[in-house]
Curated annotation (Swiss-Prot):
Binds 2 heme b groups non-covalently. It comes from the Eukaryota. Its EC number is 7.2.1.3. Residues 228-266 are annotated as: Disordered. This is Plasma membrane ascorbate-dependent reductase CYBRD1. Residues 15-221 form the Cytochrome b561 domain. It is found in: Cell membrane; Apical cell membrane. One of its GO terms (molecular function) is transmembrane ascorbate ferrireductase activity. The lineage of its organism: Eukaryota, Metazoa, Chordata, Craniata, Vertebrata. It comes from Pongo abelii.
Amino acid sequence: MAMEGYWRFLALLGSALLVGFLSVIFTLVWVLHYREGLGWDGSALEFNWHPVLMVTGFVFIQGIAIIVYRLSWTWKCSKLLMKSIHAGLNAVAAILAVISVVAVFENHNVNNIANMYSLHSWVGLIAVICYLLQLLAGFSVFLLPWAPLSLRAFLMPIHVYSGIVIFGTVIATALMGVTEKLIFSLRDPAYSTFPPEGVFFVNTLGLLILVFGALIFWIVTRPQWKRPKEPDSTILHPSGGTEQGARGSMPAYSGNNMDKSDSELNNEVAARKRNLALDEAGQRSTM
């Protein structure tokens, strides 16, 4: 199936990938060149893992996971495969986010620095917890086969909306964290004196993160770029059979079945429409 505005989609996708990749590179250069590198010894070098893993996992990889269903060349792949890729990318992002949080707590504890006192830490921890819950719920309901279509239909809009909200919260938290780190780290020269690290480099990193988030938001909210419903879906009916079978072999009304009441016909049509709606929701259980 051809995608409407395909070249515009490719341009935005390419821009998002470029900006996201630059965000990761800028973060690495920041900690390796300006902040003395990486380590795992409780020092500031361990803390430096926090921005690296957060930008790489919680920002960049999560952004890709959000739009993976909108890649038109994947529409021929099975929905189960795409769900697995979506869940796998989110799982990688979650693991990196958890490791980055551990690095912060270990650094603070070793150096007797208070934990969880800033707005950045509050919002960031809430985002991580909500993300883990979102990942668990999505895996349980949309990837495993046990959940009925009615449950998927009910949870699908919540899953989509909460995913977008969490991603937006992560972008805002990253911007707060970058600013907070600069204020705490830049003493001589101070941040307010326009040092190259802060004004010309890390501020640019913040803008890259913001632009990446905006591009992901735009791509994921365009209805014309949404993965189409699979045409060969099979819908079970209360009376047995499938929607495909019902469409392909409608009963030939003769003298034996012409006496079916209008109410029975209406009930059958209503049940069929209800199952179609549930199937539509179940097939589009992701963004």
